[in-house]
């Protein structure tokens, strides 16, 4: 069985060296203003700086001081302390996934400085995960539930916005950190330096982690070691009411999985990701217009590349009650290389309107282009030599997905202590398979296949609303409703993937996943306590899951058997979720 690697970290020693005073600059984009030590500003729920106390949704913040003092080996260990947040790794050490309110990581939206980290390889129980250097972080904002029409799809479970450091009020300040993890006999080192010179601000960071096999009461588990490294740069320039920013970052991970086989059923088993790399270039522009109604304009754009190599091997021998066969050895090997290239641009305006209305409007365009190259080998050999068959395959896919969306959110203070937030987002999505070629070799026979070009499209409007009352001392009450929307990934729509001797087919007829979410909450801030509590209920439909093939067209007529495993994606699942959180 696959061994679920525990997330507990045992720290033997920690070194934290302050080069100079650490500066709290808490900015999400170059438009965000500096804040006092008594306030916590958040940006994820309103796409502009606002007090945490006035947030229309359940949100929690891991601030700079917590990150600076943390001796955890990963930011994931800080996230899992938040109620409603669960960290998993799908038995791939170091490949951390975030679940919120029971929803799979593929239904959690990951942002870096408000820019989405898309992952078209996402499946049933895995998404993009944590591919960021924590030494670059100023803070982390976690929104529970899909309560931000301002950021888009994928957020049925919630949103995690990683906000990076962007300069300071000194020429140079920084942190050098080294953590030894006795559970893996591994070290993690990181350094971050930031500062300001005239109208310029900067940040340079880097990290390296080399973790060994995990220690257990029964000894160290083989093949649980992993390694990652990252680098990042921020450059900003401020001129009057204009602010410009450039960010560059890179993160690379290599990992594998441990497999427990006490009965010796497998002669070979391995699941490896020798390379998972994310590279991004982002630009930001903000200006304070300070007109009668129009107050701020924000623009950002980015290019992002995610490359992955996946290698899998399974070899097993089973007895067969036939004198001509006696025993059959089946050996499967798969090697896949895929690359996702993303381009996106966002334009946003902030208005102050009469009758105490604060309006944010904007438009966004995003395109993902994915290429996948795979090679595989499957052999079947009997002990007697009666069966001796080997098939080698190669395939290549190209696909793309484009999204255009318009969004708006308005805060209306219509009476003393009362605030009503209303938001809407309209999507237009288009996905298409532009190329799908395959070839197989069996006993000297060559078979070529070419998939027909396919496409899928959708348009959807999602809404959210929140009503808040703050007429009591140190207490705010809220009631909220929001809709969730997750469009199928390119892998789920078009691609054929192989692992462990099984094949999963895409389904171009998939529908988007939907949810309706309700919440009642209260915040208390007094007597040195800040308490946020919420009761939530969610109804979801059209969840996408993988099913066993039964000879249907989507499976190319293949049927699952004891020797071959075939699956396909379909909309089948519904879910009702409810819970209580106090933090």
What is the predicted role of each segment?
Residues 1-82, 194-195, 229, 281, ...:
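N-terminal Sec signal peptide and the immediately downstream disordered periplasmic leader
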Residues 21, 34-170, 185, 485, ...:
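Acidic, small-polar-rich N-terminal luminal/periplasmic segments of exported/outer-membrane proteins
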Residues 39, 96, 158, 172-174, ...:
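Hydrophobic, lipid-facing positions within transmembrane beta-strands of outer-membrane proteins
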Residues 124, 177-178, 216-223, 263-273, ...:
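Extracellular loop and loop/strand-boundary signature of outer-membrane beta-barrel proteins
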Residues 178-184, 197-199, 208-212, 239-241, ...:
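Transmembrane beta-strands of outer-membrane beta-barrel pores
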Residues 180-210, 220-258, 273-290, 294, ...:
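Transmembrane beta-barrel wall of Gram-negative outer-membrane proteins
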Residues 243-251, 276-443, 452, 457-470, ...:
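Face-selective signature of the C-terminal outer-membrane beta-barrel domain
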Residues 334-348, 403-405, 505-511, 517, ...:
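Outer membrane beta-barrel strand-and-loop segments of large Gram-negative receptors
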């Amino acid at each position: 069985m696959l061994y679920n690697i525990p997330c507990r970290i045992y720290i033997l020693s920690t070194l934290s060296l302050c080069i100079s005073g650490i500066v709290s600059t808490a900015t999400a984009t170059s438009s965000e203003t500096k804040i006092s030590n008594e306030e916590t500003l958040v940006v994820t729920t309103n796409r502009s700086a606002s007090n945490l106390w006035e947030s229309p949704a359940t949100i929690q913040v891991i601030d700079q001081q917590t990150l600076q003092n943390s001796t955890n080996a990963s930011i994931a260990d800080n996230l899992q302390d938040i109620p409603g947040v669960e960290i998993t790794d799908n038995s791939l050490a170091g490949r951390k996934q975030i679940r919120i309110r029971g929803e799979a990581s593929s239904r959690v939206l990951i942002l870096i400085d408000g820019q989405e980290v898309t992952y078209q390889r996402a499946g049933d129980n895995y998404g993009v995960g944590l591919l960021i250097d924590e030494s670059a972080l100023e803070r982390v904002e976690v929104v529970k539930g899909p309560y931000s029409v301002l950021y888009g799809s994928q957020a049925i479970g919630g949103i995690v916005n990683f906000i990076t450091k962007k300069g300071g009020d000194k020429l140079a300040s920084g942190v050098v950190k080294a953590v030894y993890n006795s559970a893996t006999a591994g070290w993690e080192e990181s350094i971050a330096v930031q500062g300001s010179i005239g109208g310029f601000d900067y940040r340079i960071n880097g990290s390296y982690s080399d973790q060994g096999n995990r220690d257990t009461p029964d000894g160290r588990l083989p093949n649980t070691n992993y390694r990652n490294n990252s680098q990042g740069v921020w450059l900003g320039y401020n001129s009057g009411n204009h602010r410009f920013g450039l960010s560059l970052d890179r993160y690379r991970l290599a990992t594998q999985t441990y497999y427990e086989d006490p009965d010796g059923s497998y002669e070979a088993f391995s699941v490896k990701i020798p390379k998972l790399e994310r590279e991004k270039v982002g630009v930001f522009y903000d200006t304070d217009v300070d007109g009668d109604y129009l107050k701020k304009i924000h623009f950002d754009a980015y290019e992002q590349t995610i490359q992955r190599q996946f290698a899998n091997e399974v070899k097993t021998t089973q007895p067969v009650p036939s004198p001509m066969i006696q025993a059959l050895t089946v050996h499967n090997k798969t090697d896949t290389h895929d690359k996702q290239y993303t381009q996106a641009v966002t334009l946003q305006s902030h208005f102050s309107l009469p009758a105490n209305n604060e309006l944010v409007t904007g438009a966004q365009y995003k395109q993902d282009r994915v290429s996948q190259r795979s090679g595989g080998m499957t052999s079947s050999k009997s002990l007697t030599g009666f069966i001796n068959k080997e098939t080698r395959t190669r395939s290549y896919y190209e696909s793309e997905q484009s999204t255009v969306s318009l969004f708006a959110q308005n805060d209306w203070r219509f009476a003393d202590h009362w605030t009503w937030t209303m938001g809407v987002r309209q999507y237009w999505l288009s996905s298409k398979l532009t190329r799908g070629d395959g070839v197989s070799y069996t006993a000297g026979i060559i078979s070529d296949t070419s998939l027909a070009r396919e496409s899928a499209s959708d348009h959807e409007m999602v809404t959210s609303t929140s009503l808040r009352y703050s007429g009591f001392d140190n207490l705010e009450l809220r009631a909220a409703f929001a809709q969730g929307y997750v469009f199928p990934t390119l892998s789920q729509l078009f691609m054929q993937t192989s692992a462990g001797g099984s094949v999963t087919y895409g389904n171009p007829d998939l529908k988007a996943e939907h949810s309706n979410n309700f919440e009642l909450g209260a915040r208390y801030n007094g007597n040195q306590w800040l308490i946020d509590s919420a009761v939530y209920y969610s109804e979801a439909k059209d969840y996408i899951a993988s099913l066993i093939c039964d000879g249907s067209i989507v499976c190319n007529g293949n049927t699952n058997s004891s020797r071959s495993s075939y699956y396909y994606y379909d909309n089948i699942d519904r879910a009702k979720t409810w819970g209580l959180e106090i933090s």
